[in-house]
Curated annotation (Swiss-Prot):
GO BP, sorted A to Z: single fertilization
Gene coding for it: SPMI
Presence of the UniProt keyword DNA repair in the record: no
Molecular function via GO: heparin binding
Subcellular location: Secreted
Official protein name in the record: Seminal plasma sperm motility inhibitor
PROSITE patterns noted in UniProt: CUB, SPERMADHESIN_1
Family: Belongs to the spermadhesin family.
Matches recorded under Pfam families: CUB
Length: 137
């Protein structure tokens, strides 16, 4: 194989690796600031009772969140999703049940997990990705 034909393949393979690793980034820490185009939030640590994650996409994009079925109790544990543009009184509170899909109206959304300290932590998974404002999920 000539060196000239090997370079495009090397570039292609390195690009595919970069894309696949970027899409698998997420957070299992208690809170944080996520600016990836896609990722996940997962929490299962027992000590912290309140965690807040802020997800930010590029301007002109909105965020799609897929919240997998939860095993949280309504009063003692909850997961809240807030949309930056919607205002402080407009949020989704999820306590359990089926899979939820939430579409933000702006490029910033906040996910908050809270529980009473006398209850053990319950794991959950939230997947997110960004799409252009005019696109449908």
């Amino acid at each position: 194989m000539k060196l000239g034909s090997a370079i495009p393949w090397a570039l292609l393979l390195s690009t595919x690796t970069l894309v696949s690793t970027a899409q698998n980034k997420g957070s299992d820490d208690c809170g944080g600031f996520l600016k990836n185009y896609s990722g996940w939030i997962s929490y299962y640590k027992a000590l912290t009772t309140n965690c807040v994650w802020t997800i930010e996409m590029k301007p002109g994009h909105k965020i799609i969140l897929q919240i997998l079925p939860l095993n949280l109790w309504t009063i003692e544990m909850k997961l809240e999703v807030r949309d930056q543009r919607a205002g402080p009184d407009n949020f989704l509170k999820v306590c359990g049940g089926t899979t939820f899909v939430y579409q933000s109206s702006s490029n910033v959304a906040t996910v908050k997990y809270s529980r009473e300290s006398h209850h053990p932590a319950s794991s959950f998974n939230v997947y997110f990705y960004g799409i252009p404002q005019g696109a449908k999920a």
